Amino acid sequence: LIAPSMERELRAALTEQANEGAIRNFALNLRPLLMQPPVRGHVTMGLDPGYSHGCKVAVVDPTGKVLDTAVVYPTFSKAKRAEAIETLRRLMDRYEVTHIALGNGTASRETEAMVCELLRQKHGAAYMIVSEAGAADYCATPLAAEEFPQYDVNLRSAVSIARRLQDPLAELVKIDPKAIGVGQYQHDVPEKQLDEALSGVVEDCVNAVGVDLNTASPSLLRRVAGLNATTAKNIVAYREEHGAFTARRQVLKVPKLGQRAYEQAAGFLRVPESPQVLDHTGVHPESYAAAETLLGLCGYRLADVGALTELPARLEAYGPARAAEACGIGMPTLRDIVRELCKPGRDPRDELPQPALRTDVLELKDLKPGMVLTGTVRNVIDFGVFVDIGVHQDGLVHISQVCNKFIKHPSEAVSVGDIVRVAVLEVDEKRKRISLTMRGVPGDGETGPDCQKTAR
């Protein structure tokens, strides 16, 4: 009689443990994906490949504004392929496109070959494969229809793909985190627990980067601590009616945004147009007086912010503990203020390696055992790491091949989005499987065989 009861209890405990592990793994992979470095300052072309509906094309300016759209059919015939290449070349010339974001879905192999043929004629441009996970779901939502009422659902996905290269965080926050597809067993775990864990990760990432109060979308603003969907929409509506914000405190005039919400959100909101230089930084308004006092103690003024290269040395000479006491703050707050004053408006993503751009394509048949390649980590799961090496089929680095010493989980060595060097172990063309190793492969400053994980 007791055996079935014990079995149920044990099974329930193991299921709970497995659920927690799957949720933890998803959250662990989601953070580096959201924190991928943006590719700023470039006119970008987004391509959403397809067969029957064609390849959707969108050109966006450096701010993400749509400049032009088109639909080409490179898979229909040789004539249509030539016509597609000419259309893309004409768009690239007209808008001076330097970067192409190519979705990794249906027909991406044929489209990539076309892009490479185009880039042989257009020197100076490069492309990158971008995950289009969740793009189709987003483009059919009321949010996408509100943002792009004049565009067809299919064209919206091309815009989303282009923007994912320019600023992954700003675009991915519009998508349900579960649809991004960087976990394992996400459809088998309790949905409520998964939602709570992933929402927390998204909010942490948005708050770590900060948002520009005058350019942020409602999707981005609602992820800021203290704000919600209603106040985010009200901020955008106020901005459209009254023009750009010129001070942080001006956000208090937004309907339904009270003092308490302001106190929570203020440190994460940036106002580059403000005459108060501290509004450009992550220093909280409550710490403005302390920041000014600190500058005075070190022989600086507010006008010097942005050129405080000697601030850490001067603070060390004065005495950090003494300065903290004089400013009426604790040491952690002092360190935060110094970091923000030295790099006002800093974006932690800029300190990470830039995405790997390509100009040519590899085929599966080109791979040979022993070849050393550079790739991008696409997913980290319990038994290994999937790496995109540019052949339309991610290669697997088994956990035993990640580094030279024993590790309990691949996440101890790599994260989603890391640029890694791998060697080909085996290629099975028939089953389209690629076995890779990172052991003994000379590194390039990233994750080498000693498993020194890059801080994110």
Predicted regions mapped to residue ranges:
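Short nucleic-acid-contacting surface segments enriched for D/E, G, S/T with interspersed K/R
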Residues: 407-421
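Flexible glycine-rich surface loops and low-complexity tracts that mediate binding to linear polymers
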Residues: 375-378, 417-432
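OB-fold/S1-family single-stranded nucleic acid-binding modules
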Residues: 429-448
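Long, highly charged, low-complexity intrinsically disordered interaction regions
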Residues: 137, 146-244, 259-295, 329-359, ...
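Extended, charged alpha/beta regions that create polyanion-binding interfaces
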Residues: 1-40, 294-359
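Short aromatic-glycine-enriched beta-strand elements
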Residues: 382-387, 394, 432-434
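OB-fold (S1/OB) nucleic-acid-binding surfaces
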Residues: 387-403
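Duplex nucleic acid-engaging cores and interfaces of nucleic-acid transaction enzymes
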Residues: 1-46, 50-151, 158
